């Protein structure tokens, strides 16, 4: 709607201007401070200029009123125009708020957890954010592909195999074992040990077979990770292996060398990242010739940046903050524009239950499992809460609040609005088709404002995507639900003289809730279950 209004205003004003959304919808639906910008040029007061501009909008179909207030030009949208938009939305509900196909393309890499165990609650935040960003981008018409980078090489995979071997020796073969300082523990390791013993037999469990054992376990863990994601309605397009990039390492090093991006010192090869804003240079090849994790990651990012996407986006844990300058430096040395590599950081999550810290999972040792939380509160509540705050801010929540059936539980509160609307239609014995001819002229000011808010979802979605600020969607839904409940409690609907106008208004509110929830990966309920 905002873009339509902007274009209508531009036809009359014939110049560029900023169009704002005032918080107080009783004051205006849209406003522009254009008069303040023109004051210096025209050598007149903003108040006079705003009055002159307002006079150009007399009898315009889109606007109920255009007023000059303290130098601002305030626009109120007409019921006739809002009704036209309502008809379009209700006639094609599946296309509501959808964007036209765009040429801009994105590659999002996210989750990319080591395949050494099930996903924990820290992984879940980036996973939910990435999946919702994907749904939103595609809805708005962008080309958007997703990828999971599987760290299937290096020490952590060997450590997985070693941990299973030691578990077999200790728990099944009853041998005395000495555990290293770092190893994987938890019931899932014991379960893998039992399964491996049944599959491979006693003779297999020796140090020389650790790589084979690790490979087998890594594949099992990747299946489990995909199941964890699926449980939260998350599907990633493709999984790429770190090992598949081994052969490209030498060519990448040559390219970095040509661009003076690396140098040798102390028997190691260093990335000269301090030249590009990093706090110091970084080792990418060790003294024994083995590449560091950074080396493999540079090769992978070089491949991603070479695939022709307009922008490559990564979602990383906040503990990777210091990793950003070195990766951007490497891309600059390789001839890429590092602005086309965008990093979104997912901050830590603190989980409570009845005000106390949530218990760690026995299955995973020191972590809270994503699957445990989904089992307890459902994927809808999990997704909502992870999207309720900006991704790079710390999130603390008490899962007990998400099990309440009152306004303190936002998922329940918003769903209750959606279900209430279905209930009202049932009580009136009507369907949406029965109210399509209603012209909405009888709506009072609160009704018009509620209709405007429901139709303004597209603006919220665009803002949320462009700013990568997905919390704008749940914020919008909370406000919409609150305004609906207030309006419903203050206005008689079934049996009123303007029943059809009110039902048509409500159907728009329901459509906005359903559309926004769908983009968040949440199902809007038609009936509340107690």
Language model regions located:
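Short, charged, solvent-exposed linker or helix-capping segments at domain edges/interfaces
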Residues: 84-89
């Amino acid at each position: 709607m905002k873009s339509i209004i902007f274009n209508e205003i531009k036809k009359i004003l014939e110049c560029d201007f900023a169009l704002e959304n005032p918080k107080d919808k009783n004051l205006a639906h849209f406003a522009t401070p254009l008069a303040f910008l023109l004051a210096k040029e025209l050598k007149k007061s903003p108040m006079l200029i705003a009055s002159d501009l307002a006079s150009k909008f007399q009898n315009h179909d889109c606007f109920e009123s255009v007023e000059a207030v303290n130098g601002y030009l305030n626009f109120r949208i007409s019921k006739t125009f809002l009704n036209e938009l309502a008809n379009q939305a209700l006639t094609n509900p599946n296309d509501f708020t959808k964007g036209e196909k765009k040429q801009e393309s994105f590659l999002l890499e996210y989750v990319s957890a080591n395949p050494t165990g099930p996903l924990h609650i820290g992984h879940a935040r980036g996973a939910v954010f990435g999946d919702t960003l994907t749904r939103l981008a595609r809805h708005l018409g962008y080309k958007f592909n997703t990828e999971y980078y599987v760290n299937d090489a290096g020490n952590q995979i060997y450590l997985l195999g070693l941990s299973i071997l030691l578990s077999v020796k200790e728990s099944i073969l009853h041998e005395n074992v000495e555990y290293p300082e770092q190893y994987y523990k938890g019931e899932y390791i014991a379960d893998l040990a039992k399964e491996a013993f049944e599959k491979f037999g006693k003779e297999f469990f020796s140090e020389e077979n650790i790589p084979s054992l690790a490979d087998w376990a890594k594949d099992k863990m990747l299946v489990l990770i995909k199941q964890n994601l699926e449980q939260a309605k998350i599907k990633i397009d493709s999984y790429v292996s770190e090992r598949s990039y081994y052969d490209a390492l030498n060519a990448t090093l040559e390219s970095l060398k040509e661009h003076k991006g690396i140098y040798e010192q102390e028997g190691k090869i260093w990335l000269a990242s301090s030249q590009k804003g990093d706090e110091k240079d970084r080792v990418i090849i060790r003294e024994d010739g083995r590449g560091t994790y950074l080396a493999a990651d540079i090769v992978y990012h070089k491949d991603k940046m070479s695939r022709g996407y307009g922008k490559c986006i990564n979602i990383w844990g906040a503990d990777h903050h210091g990793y950003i300058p070195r990766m951007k430096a490497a891309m600059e040395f390789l001839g890429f524009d590092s602005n086309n590599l965008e990093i979104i950081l997912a901050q830590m999550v603190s989980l409570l239950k009845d005000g106390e810290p949530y218990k760690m999972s026995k299955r995973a040792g020191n972590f809270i499992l994503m699957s445990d939380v989904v089992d307890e509160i459902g994927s809808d509540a999990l997704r909502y809460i992870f999207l309720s705050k900006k991704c790079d801010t710390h999130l603390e929540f008490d899962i007990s609040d998400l099990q309440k059936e009152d306004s303190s539980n936002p998922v329940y509160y918003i769903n209750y609005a959606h279900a209430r609307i279905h209930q009202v239609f049932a009580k009136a014995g009507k369907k949406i088709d029965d109210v399509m001819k209603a012209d909405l002229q009888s709506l009072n000011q609160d009704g018009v404002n509620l209709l405007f808010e429901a139709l303004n979802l597209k603006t919220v979605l665009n803002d949320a995507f462009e700013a990568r600020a997905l919390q704008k969607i749940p914020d919008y839904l909370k406000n919409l639900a609150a305004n609906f409940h207030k309006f419903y409690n203050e206005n008689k609907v079934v049996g009123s003289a303007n029943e059809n106008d009110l039902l048509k208004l409500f159907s728009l509110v329901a459509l906005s809730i359903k559309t926004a929830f769908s983009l968040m990966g949440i199902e809007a309920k038609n009936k509340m279950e107690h």
